[in-house]
Amino acid sequence: MVDNHRLPPLVLVVLSLTLTCACLGNTPGHGDPNPGLISPALAATMIEEMRDDPGFVIIDVRTVDEFAAGHIPGAINIDSATLAEQIDNLDPNGTYLIYCRRGGRSAGVHSLMREAGFSEVYEIEGGISAWQAEGLPVAVG
């Protein structure tokens, strides 16, 4: 008797590979129109490679006081609470790297920017906390 509820092994392999590729495609450089979270190490590489590109902007979405206490060198501060009011001042064709303390606020900003038509928005996974944990540079002031 044939078990009609069991998937053939080949179908399982194809399904697994498809899901794996879909997940891996959510990183920069894979042509994904909806980029998402990137590691602090990848963010540091991106900053190094794009530092001279005027269309590349690092945005710290924490409060002014949090920003002053320590931020990624070259970042600008736009508090997540006011970003919706300031989004028209940003170029939707630019490349943005956003972060907050741990990822909560930047996730909301990431969604807001994507919904507003920004196509190149990257979010640092774990925020500046993860950045600092990896020993990456922080500016004060």
Positions of the model-derived regions?
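Rhodanese-like catalytic fold shared by cysteine-dependent sulfurtransferases
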Residues: 2-57, 64-95, 104-141
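Short, surface-exposed ligand- or partner-binding patches at beta-edge/loop junctions that are enriched
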Residues: 99-100
